[in-house]
Protein backbone atom coordinates (compact mmCIF):
# COMPACT_ATOMS: atom_id res chain seq x y z
CA UNK A 1 0.00 0.00 0.00
CA UNK A 2 2.67 2.47 -1.00
CA UNK A 3 2.47 5.66 -2.96
CA UNK A 4 4.14 7.23 -5.93
CA UNK A 5 5.82 10.60 -5.91
CA UNK A 6 3.93 11.65 -9.02
CA UNK A 7 1.51 14.42 -8.15
CA UNK A 8 -0.92 16.64 -9.97
CA UNK A 9 -3.02 19.55 -8.79
CA UNK A 10 -6.56 19.97 -10.04
CA UNK A 11 -8.16 23.28 -10.86
CA UNK A 12 -10.35 24.48 -8.02
CA UNK A 13 -14.04 24.74 -8.80
CA UNK A 14 -17.24 25.47 -6.93
CA UNK A 15 -18.26 21.80 -7.20
CA UNK A 16 -18.70 21.63 -3.48
CA UNK A 17 -22.01 23.63 -4.09
CA UNK A 18 -24.75 21.85 -5.92
CA UNK A 19 -25.71 21.63 -10.01
CA UNK A 20 -41.50 42.03 -7.86
CA UNK A 21 -37.91 41.02 -8.69
CA UNK A 22 -35.73 43.63 -10.23
CA UNK A 23 -32.39 42.43 -11.49
CA UNK A 24 -29.43 44.06 -9.74
CA UNK A 25 -28.19 46.90 -11.88
CA UNK A 26 -25.36 45.57 -14.07
CA UNK A 27 -22.42 47.65 -15.20
CA UNK A 28 -23.39 50.14 -17.89
CA UNK A 29 -20.08 49.37 -19.61
CA UNK A 30 -21.40 45.93 -20.55
CA UNK A 31 -24.11 46.91 -23.03
CA UNK A 32 -25.34 44.10 -25.29
CA UNK A 33 -25.64 44.74 -29.04
CA UNK A 34 -29.31 45.04 -30.06
CA UNK A 35 -29.17 41.95 -32.31
CA UNK A 36 -27.89 39.68 -29.54
CA UNK A 37 -30.40 37.51 -27.66
CA UNK A 38 -30.34 36.58 -24.00
CA UNK A 39 -30.14 32.91 -24.91
CA UNK A 40 -27.13 33.49 -27.18
CA UNK A 41 -25.33 35.41 -24.44
CA UNK A 42 -25.94 32.59 -21.97
CA UNK A 43 -24.63 30.03 -24.47
CA UNK A 44 -21.49 32.13 -24.91
CA UNK A 45 -21.08 32.43 -21.14
CA UNK A 46 -21.35 28.64 -20.83
CA UNK A 47 -18.52 28.33 -23.34
CA UNK A 48 -16.39 30.71 -21.29
CA UNK A 49 -17.18 28.73 -18.14
CA UNK A 50 -16.09 25.53 -19.87
CA UNK A 51 -12.81 27.26 -20.75
CA UNK A 52 -12.45 28.41 -17.09
CA UNK A 53 -12.66 32.04 -18.24
CA UNK A 54 -14.89 33.19 -15.40
CA UNK A 55 -14.20 36.89 -15.84
CA UNK A 56 -15.32 36.66 -19.46
CA UNK A 57 -18.33 34.59 -18.45
CA UNK A 58 -19.31 37.18 -15.84
CA UNK A 59 -19.30 40.00 -18.40
CA UNK A 60 -21.53 37.99 -20.72
CA UNK A 61 -23.89 37.13 -17.87
CA UNK A 62 -24.15 40.81 -16.95
CA UNK A 63 -25.09 41.57 -20.54
CA UNK A 64 -27.69 38.79 -20.46
CA UNK A 65 -29.16 40.09 -17.19
CA UNK A 66 -29.32 43.63 -18.51
CA UNK A 67 -30.95 42.59 -21.78
CA UNK A 68 -33.43 40.22 -20.11
CA UNK A 69 -34.39 42.89 -17.59
CA UNK A 70 -34.97 45.46 -20.32
CA UNK A 71 -37.10 43.04 -22.35
CA UNK A 72 -39.14 42.17 -19.27
CA UNK A 73 -39.86 45.83 -18.53
CA UNK A 74 -40.78 46.56 -22.15
CA UNK A 75 -43.28 43.70 -22.34
CA UNK A 76 -44.93 44.60 -19.04
CA UNK A 77 -47.65 42.42 -17.51
CA UNK A 78 -47.71 38.85 -18.75
CA UNK A 79 -44.03 38.82 -19.72
CA UNK A 80 -42.12 35.59 -19.11
CA UNK A 81 -39.42 36.16 -16.45
CA UNK A 82 -37.66 32.82 -16.97
CA UNK A 83 -34.79 34.17 -19.08
CA UNK A 84 -33.94 36.76 -16.45
CA UNK A 85 -34.31 34.14 -13.73
CA UNK A 86 -31.87 31.82 -15.51
CA UNK A 87 -29.40 34.60 -16.28
CA UNK A 88 -29.30 35.61 -12.62
CA UNK A 89 -28.77 32.01 -11.53
CA UNK A 90 -25.88 31.50 -13.96
CA UNK A 91 -24.36 34.83 -12.95
CA UNK A 92 -24.47 33.70 -9.32
CA UNK A 93 -22.62 30.46 -10.09
CA UNK A 94 -19.91 32.38 -11.97
CA UNK A 95 -19.53 34.77 -9.05
CA UNK A 96 -19.06 31.79 -6.73
CA UNK A 97 -16.15 30.66 -8.89
CA UNK A 98 -14.65 34.14 -8.63
CA UNK A 99 -15.16 34.28 -4.87
CA UNK A 100 -17.72 37.10 -5.07
CA UNK A 101 -19.91 35.55 -2.40
CA UNK A 102 -21.99 38.60 -1.47
CA UNK A 103 -22.88 39.34 -5.09
CA UNK A 104 -23.65 35.66 -5.73
CA UNK A 105 -26.06 35.56 -2.79
CA UNK A 106 -27.85 38.69 -4.05
CA UNK A 107 -28.28 37.25 -7.53
CA UNK A 108 -29.46 33.86 -6.28
CA UNK A 109 -32.03 35.62 -4.09
CA UNK A 110 -33.21 37.70 -7.07
CA UNK A 111 -33.50 34.55 -9.17
CA UNK A 112 -35.63 32.90 -6.48
CA UNK A 113 -37.93 35.91 -6.28
CA UNK A 114 -38.48 35.78 -10.04
CA UNK A 115 -39.01 32.03 -9.94
CA UNK A 116 -42.04 32.48 -7.70
CA UNK A 117 -43.91 33.74 -10.78
CA UNK A 118 -42.95 30.75 -12.96
CA UNK A 119 -44.43 27.25 -13.16
CA UNK A 120 -41.01 25.55 -13.12
CA UNK A 121 -38.79 27.10 -10.43
CA UNK A 122 -35.19 25.95 -10.22
CA UNK A 123 -33.95 24.29 -7.01
CA UNK A 124 -30.32 25.30 -7.65
CA UNK A 125 -30.41 28.83 -6.12
CA UNK A 126 -31.92 27.39 -2.95
CA UNK A 127 -29.22 24.69 -2.81
CA UNK A 128 -26.49 27.28 -3.26
CA UNK A 129 -27.96 29.61 -0.64
CA UNK A 130 -28.34 26.70 1.78
CA UNK A 131 -24.54 26.39 1.65
CA UNK A 132 -24.01 30.15 1.94
CA UNK A 133 -26.58 31.02 4.61
CA UNK A 134 -25.61 32.94 7.74
CA UNK A 135 -27.76 30.86 10.11
CA UNK A 136 -28.65 27.15 10.29
CA UNK A 137 -32.35 28.01 10.29
CA UNK A 138 -31.98 29.93 7.03
CA UNK A 139 -29.98 27.08 5.55
CA UNK A 140 -32.63 24.57 6.61
CA UNK A 141 -35.33 26.68 4.95
CA UNK A 142 -33.44 26.77 1.65
CA UNK A 143 -32.79 23.03 1.72
CA UNK A 144 -36.48 22.45 2.42
CA UNK A 145 -37.55 24.73 -0.44
CA UNK A 146 -35.17 22.99 -2.84
CA UNK A 147 -36.49 19.61 -1.71
CA UNK A 148 -40.08 20.71 -2.32
CA UNK A 149 -39.23 21.82 -5.87
CA UNK A 150 -37.40 18.56 -6.59
CA UNK A 151 -40.23 16.44 -5.20
CA UNK A 152 -42.69 18.33 -7.40
CA UNK A 153 -40.50 17.58 -10.43
CA UNK A 154 -40.42 13.89 -9.54
CA UNK A 155 -44.20 13.84 -9.10
CA UNK A 156 -44.60 15.43 -12.55
CA UNK A 157 -42.32 12.77 -14.03
CA UNK A 158 -44.36 10.01 -12.43
CA UNK A 159 -47.57 11.49 -13.84
CA UNK A 160 -45.94 11.72 -17.25
CA UNK A 161 -44.97 8.04 -17.12
CA UNK A 162 -48.55 7.12 -16.32
CA UNK A 163 -49.99 9.56 -18.85
CA UNK A 164 -52.22 11.07 -16.17
CA UNK A 165 -52.11 14.69 -17.24
CA UNK A 166 -51.50 14.52 -20.95
CA UNK A 167 -47.73 14.51 -21.02
CA UNK A 168 -46.50 16.62 -18.14
CA UNK A 169 -42.73 16.39 -18.11
CA UNK A 170 -40.56 16.51 -21.22
CA UNK A 171 -38.37 13.71 -22.53
CA UNK A 172 -35.36 15.60 -21.24
CA UNK A 173 -36.90 15.67 -17.76
CA UNK A 174 -37.55 11.94 -17.96
CA UNK A 175 -33.90 11.34 -18.80
CA UNK A 176 -32.85 13.58 -15.91
CA UNK A 177 -34.79 11.67 -13.26
CA UNK A 178 -31.61 10.21 -11.78
CA UNK A 179 -30.09 13.66 -11.44
CA UNK A 180 -33.24 15.01 -9.78
CA UNK A 181 -33.26 12.12 -7.32
CA UNK A 182 -29.59 12.70 -6.51
CA UNK A 183 -30.20 16.42 -5.88
CA UNK A 184 -33.15 15.61 -3.60
CA UNK A 185 -31.04 13.09 -1.74
CA UNK A 186 -28.25 15.65 -1.25
CA UNK A 187 -30.75 18.20 0.07
CA UNK A 188 -31.89 15.69 2.68
CA UNK A 189 -28.27 14.91 3.54
CA UNK A 190 -27.65 18.63 4.00
CA UNK A 191 -30.62 18.90 6.33
CA UNK A 192 -29.34 15.91 8.31
CA UNK A 193 -25.89 17.48 8.66
CA UNK A 194 -27.46 20.62 10.12
CA UNK A 195 -29.09 18.53 12.83
CA UNK A 196 -25.77 16.78 13.44
CA UNK A 197 -23.98 20.09 13.99
CA UNK A 198 -25.58 23.51 14.49
CA UNK A 199 -29.01 22.15 15.42
CA UNK A 200 -27.82 19.11 17.38
CA UNK A 201 -29.40 20.33 20.64
CA UNK A 202 -32.87 20.67 19.13
CA UNK A 203 -35.23 18.12 20.73
CA UNK A 204 -36.17 16.65 17.34
CA UNK A 205 -32.57 16.41 16.07
CA UNK A 206 -32.08 12.64 16.28
CA UNK A 207 -35.57 11.88 14.98
CA UNK A 208 -35.09 14.20 12.00
CA UNK A 209 -31.70 12.68 11.17
CA UNK A 210 -33.26 9.23 10.97
CA UNK A 211 -36.24 10.48 8.97
CA UNK A 212 -34.25 12.48 6.43
CA UNK A 213 -31.72 9.72 5.75
CA UNK A 214 -34.47 7.15 5.31
CA UNK A 215 -36.11 9.43 2.74
CA UNK A 216 -32.77 10.01 1.02
CA UNK A 217 -32.04 6.29 0.74
CA UNK A 218 -35.49 5.70 -0.75
CA UNK A 219 -35.01 8.50 -3.29
CA UNK A 220 -31.50 7.50 -4.33
CA UNK A 221 -30.12 4.25 -2.88
CA UNK A 222 -26.95 4.68 -4.97
CA UNK A 223 -25.91 7.94 -3.27
CA UNK A 224 -22.80 7.19 -1.17
CA UNK A 225 -23.20 10.38 0.87
CA UNK A 226 -26.41 9.01 2.38
CA UNK A 227 -24.54 6.11 3.99
CA UNK A 228 -21.55 8.26 4.89
CA UNK A 229 -23.85 10.66 6.74
CA UNK A 230 -25.61 7.70 8.35
CA UNK A 231 -22.20 6.62 9.65
CA UNK A 232 -21.82 10.04 11.29
CA UNK A 233 -25.24 9.66 12.90
CA UNK A 234 -24.37 6.19 14.21
CA UNK A 235 -21.08 7.51 15.61
CA UNK A 236 -22.96 10.25 17.45
CA UNK A 237 -25.13 7.46 18.91
CA UNK A 238 -21.99 5.49 19.91
CA UNK A 239 -23.01 2.63 17.61
CA UNK A 240 -19.56 2.03 16.10
CA UNK A 241 -20.22 -1.29 14.37
CA UNK A 242 -23.31 0.12 12.67
CA UNK A 243 -21.25 3.17 11.69
CA UNK A 244 -18.59 0.95 10.10
CA UNK A 245 -21.23 -0.99 8.19
CA UNK A 246 -22.83 2.18 6.83
CA UNK A 247 -19.49 3.78 5.90
CA UNK A 248 -18.26 0.69 4.06
CA UNK A 249 -21.58 0.46 2.21
CA UNK A 250 -21.20 4.02 0.95
CA UNK A 251 -17.53 3.57 0.07
CA UNK A 252 -18.12 0.42 -1.95
CA UNK A 253 -20.52 2.36 -4.19
CA UNK A 254 -17.75 4.63 -5.53
CA UNK A 255 -14.54 2.82 -4.64
CA UNK A 256 -13.98 1.32 -8.10
CA UNK A 257 -15.75 3.83 -10.35
CA UNK A 258 -14.07 6.32 -12.67
CA UNK A 259 -13.49 9.84 -11.38
CA UNK A 260 -15.77 11.31 -14.06
CA UNK A 261 -18.70 9.13 -12.97
CA UNK A 262 -21.69 11.02 -11.52
CA UNK A 263 -21.47 8.63 -8.56
CA UNK A 264 -17.91 9.73 -7.70
CA UNK A 265 -18.16 12.07 -4.68
CA UNK A 266 -16.57 15.55 -4.64
CA UNK A 267 -13.23 15.98 -2.90
CA UNK A 268 -14.59 17.36 0.42
CA UNK A 269 -16.92 14.39 0.74
CA UNK A 270 -14.09 11.92 0.15
CA UNK A 271 -11.93 13.70 2.70
CA UNK A 272 -14.76 13.41 5.23
CA UNK A 273 -15.04 9.71 4.41
CA UNK A 274 -11.33 9.24 5.17
CA UNK A 275 -11.69 11.09 8.48
CA UNK A 276 -14.62 8.87 9.47
CA UNK A 277 -12.63 5.74 8.66
CA UNK A 278 -9.81 7.05 10.87
CA UNK A 279 -12.24 7.79 13.69
CA UNK A 280 -13.43 4.20 13.42
CA UNK A 281 -9.82 2.85 13.39
CA UNK A 282 -10.27 1.65 9.81
CA UNK A 283 -6.78 2.73 8.75
CA UNK A 284 -6.39 0.83 5.47
CA UNK A 285 -9.48 2.22 3.67
CA UNK A 286 -8.67 5.67 5.06
CA UNK A 287 -5.20 5.48 3.51
CA UNK A 288 -6.56 4.27 0.18
CA UNK A 289 -8.78 7.34 -0.03
CA UNK A 290 -6.07 9.71 1.21
CA UNK A 291 -3.57 8.36 -1.32
CA UNK A 292 -5.98 9.22 -4.14
CA UNK A 293 -6.40 12.70 -2.70
CA UNK A 294 -2.61 13.12 -2.57
CA UNK A 295 -2.32 12.18 -6.23
CA UNK A 296 -4.97 14.72 -7.18
CA UNK A 297 -3.41 17.60 -5.26
CA UNK A 298 -0.04 17.33 -3.54
CA UNK A 299 -0.33 20.80 -2.01
CA UNK A 300 -3.14 20.06 0.43
CA UNK A 301 -1.42 20.06 3.81
CA UNK A 302 -4.43 18.61 5.62
CA UNK A 303 -4.31 15.50 3.45
CA UNK A 304 -0.60 15.02 4.25
CA UNK A 305 -1.32 15.46 7.94
CA UNK A 306 -4.13 12.89 7.88
CA UNK A 307 -2.02 10.47 5.84
CA UNK A 308 0.86 10.77 8.30
CA UNK A 309 -1.48 10.25 11.24
CA UNK A 310 -3.12 7.26 9.54
CA UNK A 311 0.24 5.59 8.82
CA UNK A 312 1.33 6.21 12.41
CA UNK A 313 -1.86 4.64 13.77
CA UNK A 314 -1.57 1.68 11.40
CA UNK A 315 2.00 1.10 12.55
CA UNK A 316 0.89 1.19 16.18
CA UNK A 317 -1.89 -1.29 15.42
CA UNK A 318 0.51 -3.63 13.60
CA UNK A 319 3.09 -3.54 16.39
CA UNK A 320 5.32 -6.61 16.46
CA UNK A 321 2.49 -9.03 15.65
CA UNK A 322 2.91 -11.57 12.82
CA UNK A 323 1.75 -10.05 9.54
CA UNK A 324 0.67 -11.17 6.10
CA UNK A 325 3.29 -11.17 3.36
CA UNK A 326 1.79 -8.13 1.62
CA UNK A 327 1.35 -6.10 4.83
CA UNK A 328 3.72 -3.33 5.86
CA UNK A 329 5.62 -3.74 9.12
CA UNK A 330 5.34 -1.21 11.91
CA UNK A 331 8.63 0.37 10.81
CA UNK A 332 7.47 0.58 7.18
CA UNK A 333 4.22 2.24 8.24
CA UNK A 334 6.10 4.75 10.35
CA UNK A 335 8.52 5.42 7.50
CA UNK A 336 5.54 6.34 5.32
CA UNK A 337 4.18 8.45 8.17
CA UNK A 338 7.41 10.42 8.36
CA UNK A 339 7.39 11.08 4.60
CA UNK A 340 3.84 12.45 4.83
CA UNK A 341 4.57 14.60 7.86
CA UNK A 342 7.71 16.02 6.25
CA UNK A 343 5.60 16.98 3.23
CA UNK A 344 3.15 18.66 5.59
CA UNK A 345 5.92 20.67 7.25
CA UNK A 346 7.37 21.75 3.90
CA UNK A 347 4.00 23.06 2.76
CA UNK A 348 3.38 24.87 6.04
CA UNK A 349 6.84 26.43 5.93
CA UNK A 350 6.23 27.66 2.39
CA UNK A 351 2.85 29.19 3.26
CA UNK A 352 2.11 29.46 7.00
CA UNK A 353 -1.05 31.55 6.50
CA UNK A 354 -4.06 29.67 7.78
CA UNK A 355 -1.92 27.10 9.58
CA UNK A 356 -3.71 25.06 12.25
CA UNK A 357 -1.73 25.40 15.54
CA UNK A 358 -3.15 22.18 17.01
CA UNK A 359 -2.36 20.28 13.83
CA UNK A 360 1.18 21.67 13.75
CA UNK A 361 1.73 20.77 17.42
CA UNK A 362 0.54 17.22 16.78
CA UNK A 363 2.83 16.85 13.75
CA UNK A 364 5.86 18.01 15.76
CA UNK A 365 4.95 15.57 18.53
CA UNK A 366 4.74 12.68 16.05
CA UNK A 367 7.98 13.71 14.34
CA UNK A 368 9.72 13.71 17.73
CA UNK A 369 8.54 10.16 18.40
CA UNK A 370 9.59 9.00 14.92
CA UNK A 371 13.03 10.58 15.31
CA UNK A 372 13.44 8.97 18.72
CA UNK A 373 12.57 5.59 17.18
CA UNK A 374 15.23 6.11 14.48
CA UNK A 375 12.69 6.09 11.65
CA UNK A 376 13.85 7.31 8.23
CA UNK A 377 11.29 8.76 5.82
CA UNK A 378 10.17 6.54 2.97
CA UNK A 379 11.29 7.38 -0.57
CA UNK A 380 7.82 6.68 -1.99
CA UNK A 381 6.49 3.71 -3.97
CA UNK A 382 8.31 1.93 -6.73
CA UNK A 383 7.03 2.34 -10.27
CA UNK A 384 6.22 -0.58 -12.52
CA UNK A 385 9.76 -0.63 -13.91
CA UNK A 386 11.23 -0.83 -10.43
CA UNK A 387 12.41 2.81 -10.46
CA UNK A 388 11.11 5.74 -8.50
CA UNK A 389 8.52 7.92 -10.18
CA UNK A 390 8.64 11.68 -9.87
CA UNK A 391 6.75 14.58 -11.37
CA UNK A 392 9.39 15.25 -14.05
CA UNK A 393 9.19 11.65 -15.26
CA UNK A 394 5.42 11.93 -15.66
CA UNK A 395 5.69 15.30 -17.41
CA UNK A 396 8.16 13.81 -19.88
CA UNK A 397 5.80 10.93 -20.61
CA UNK A 398 2.92 13.33 -21.28
CA UNK A 399 4.89 15.46 -23.75
Predicted regions: what is each one?
Residues 138-253:
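Solenoidal tandem-repeat scaffolds enriched in leucines and small polar residues
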Residues 55, 102, 137-140, 203, ...:
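Residue register within tetratricopeptide repeats
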Residues 36-70, 97, 189-201:
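Alpha-helical segment of the N-proximal tetratricopeptide repeat
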Residues 36-43, 81-93, 119-137, 178-199, ...:
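Amphipathic alpha-helical repeat scaffolds of TPR domains
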Residues 65-68, 72-73, 112-113, 147-155, ...:
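Amphipathic alpha-helical segments of tetratricopeptide repeats
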Residues 51, 98, 133-136, 198, ...:
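Structural motif corresponding to the intra-repeat A-B loop/turn of tetratricopeptide repeats
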Residues 69, 82, 116-120, 151, ...:
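Short coil turns that delineate tetratricopeptide repeat
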Residues 241-377, 397:
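Structured C-terminal portions of repeat-based eukaryotic scaffold domains
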Amino acid sequence: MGRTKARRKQASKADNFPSSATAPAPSTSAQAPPSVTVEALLVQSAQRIAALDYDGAKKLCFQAVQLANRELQEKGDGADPRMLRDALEILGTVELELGDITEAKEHFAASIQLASATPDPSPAPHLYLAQLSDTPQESLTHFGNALGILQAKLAALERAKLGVDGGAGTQEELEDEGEIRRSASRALVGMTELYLTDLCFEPEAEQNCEKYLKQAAELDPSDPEVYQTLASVRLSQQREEDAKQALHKGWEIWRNVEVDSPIYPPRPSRLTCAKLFLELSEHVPALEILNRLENEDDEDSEVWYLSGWAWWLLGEARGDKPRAEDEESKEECWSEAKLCLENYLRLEERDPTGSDPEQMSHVKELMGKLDAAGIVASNGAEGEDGGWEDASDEDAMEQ
